[in-house]
Design a protein with these regions (language model features):
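Active-site-proximal cofactor/substrate-binding loop regions of enzyme domains
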Residues: 1-13
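Short loop segments at secondary-structure junctions
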Residues: 10, 17-20
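Tryptophan-centered motif/residue detector
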Residues: 13-15, 38
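C-terminal catalytic domain of Rieske-type non-heme iron oxygenases
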Residues: 20, 24-212
Length: 212
């Protein structure tokens, strides 16, 4: 069996539905991955865990402070997080959360060129764009907005194996020096997430999935 495909310069999209409907919906936009005003790095691998586990994980970053306190923005370690503003359409779910002015992490201040003792409003955004694409944004609102975009392309290989291509994009400090600082931090973090998800899948295989 063959499927309609479309290449957009970043991904190859496969339409698994009715072939005649493939032209009715364009693939989601990921223009920042190809935009010279953004710098992007990332990697890809197979995670021995089902697609649903990865989707659930990326839909809630409040656990980042527990997985890796060093990488987490300090505001995520608070006990009184602001509420999520959620919007739902027929094809996507998106949320945003605005944080009051607060400190940024030491690595953030380094690459963003911001004082560690400064207080900056911060905005978290996330969107389930398509079953195979999750996008997060984290913006620090200083003299100019400094934004990270985290793009997760997910390909189900089996019910227990998922291909994961992750990318981290930024609209500031576009040079190699910042990338040399950032890549080891995020590569180590996502490898840690991979190991945790694989451990969770192993537990599910043994004990079953608890919907509660």
């Amino acid at each position: 069996r063959s499927y309609p495909v479309r290449e957009d310069g970043s991904f190859v999209w496969v339409w698994a539905g009715e072939p005649g409907a493939a032209t009715l919906r364009r693939p989601p936009a990921t223009h920042w991955l190809r935009d010279s005003n953004w710098a992007t790095f990332g990697s890809s691998w197979e995670t021995n865990a089902g697609l649903r586990l990865l989707q659930d994980n990326f839909a809630d970053i409040s656990h980042v402070a527990q997985v890796d306190a060093a990488i987490a923005p300090p505001v995520l370690s608070g006990t009184d997080l602001p509420p999520l503003d959620v919007s739902v359409t027929e094809t996507s779910v998106a949320f945003s959360r605005q944080f009051a002015p607060a400190h940024v992490g030491s690595w953030q201040s380094q690459v963003m060129g911001l004082p560690e003792d400064g207080l900056f409003a911060q905005l978290e955004e996330g969107e389930f764009v398509a079953p195979g694409l999750w996008v997060d944004r984290w913006s620090v609102q200083a003299d100019s907005e400094r934004t990270f975009i985290f793009t997760h392309a997910l390909t189900p290989i089996s019910d227990r194996i998922t291909g994961h291509t992750w990318s981290v994009s930024r609209n500031f400090a576009l040079g190699a020096a910042a990338q040399g600082t950032l890549f080891p931090i995020f590569d180590a973090y996502y490898r840690r997430v991979k190991a945790i998800l694989e451990g969770m899948q192993s537990m599910i295989d043994t004990d079953g999935y608890d919907e509660g």
